[in-house]
Regions:
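Ligand-binding loop in jelly-roll beta-barrel domains
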Residues: 72-93, 99
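A conserved hydrophobic position in a structured secondary element of the catalytic/binding core
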Residues: 68-69, 90, 119
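Short acidic-glycine-tyrosine-enriched beta hairpin
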Residues: 55-69
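Generic protein-terminus/edge-of-domain signal
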Residues: 1-59
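A short, compositionally biased micro-patch
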Residues: 44-46, 69, 79
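A short alpha->loop->secondary-structure connector
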Residues: 83-84, 96-112
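Amphipathic alpha-helical segments enriched in hydrophobic/aromatic residues interleaved with Lys/Arg
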Residues: 109-140
Length: 140
């Protein structure tokens, strides 16, 4: 598995990133508060992670999906050693090009207020399949 440890997770020459964090990479990248340069989705498959998103503290646990919007400040305080996160991130320029925020304007305040949503295990499996598809596409 690729070891991601780059502060600039969203490079301008890539439309999206897709990885599995099995080594605590997210915590190393965001070990102090930083602005999210793209839109990041996290899917927690096991373990837990203490994180501050947009000045609010949260705990990510198994079967949680997390949405971190661009320009949001993020700080990972702790990742348990067994934490497994799927990460899918989209470059800000890509999102601007497809007018994502215009079509989701009604939901933005809800995503800011509630960035973490617990899922039923069967729904987590569906998201896991989708994340794996994007991970495989990225490697092509």
């Amino acid at each position: 598995m690729k070891y991601i440890d780059d502060i600039n997770l969203f490079k301008s020459n890539k439309d999206f990133v897709a990885e599995i964090d099995m080594t605590g990479s997210l915590g190393r990248i965001y070990h102090y508060p930083q602005r999210m340069e793209g839109c990041l989705f996290l899917l927690c498959l096991r373990g837990e992670c203490d994180i501050t998103i947009h000045l609010s503290e949260h705990k990510i646990q198994k079967n949680d999906i997390v949405t971190i919007l661009p320009e949001t400040f993020v700080h990972v305080h702790r990742q348990s050693p067994d934490c497994r996160l799927y990460l899918i991130g989209f470059n800000k320029e890509l999102l601007n090009g497809i007018n994502l925020f215009n079509s989701t304007m009604n939901y933005l305040s809800a995503l800011i207020d509630t960035p973490i949503i617990p899922l039923r295990p069967e729904i987590t499996e569906l998201f896991q399949d989708y994340f794996m598809l994007l991970i495989k596409m990225k490697r092509m």
